[in-house]
Amino acid sequence: MAKEVFGIDLGTTNSCIAEISSLDKLPIVIKNSEELQTTPSVVFYDDYGSPIVGGEAKRCMAQDPSRAVAFIKREMSNPSYKRVIGSESISPVKVSAMILKKLVDDANLSREYKGKSKVKDVVITVPAYFGNNERELTKQAGEVAGLNVLALLNEPTAAALSYGTSHLEGKNFMIYDLGGELSM
């Protein structure tokens, strides 16, 4: 049996995880625990200092934004980024790892129900403008989340691959990465 590799879009506003369909070899997004294809890239710390990740975190953020972390990808290589919520020291790697873990935990629940193996090997997308430092920190976040990060892929390249170039042989096409940073 071939090794299963999963694709993760660790987005600024929303994130998702996908697998390749065994039927038609096309990517399929694995729904999260709320049966949605994307998970908000938000972490909220409750009254006890415990992190909540995803949709619930985004809803809680509306009530108390001071205990929430969003848009963390923008801070990935900012050495002066310092944030403490309660007694918890926040770092971009730590928050990104929590988001990745939420995606994988939800995917594993869905896969376990279907008798499939757990998510372990992944490729994570990163903005094309990310330098070596941001890429290394993103890889570290994946490792902190317990993943084997096989590669980091530029987001526009991932979009082109996801769109599927096989049916466009001999034709020109363009991928424009508008991003989602303003869609929160």
Name each region found by the language model.
Residues 1-40, 45-176, 180:
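N-terminal phosphate-binding loop and flanking beta/alpha elements of the actin-like ATPase fold
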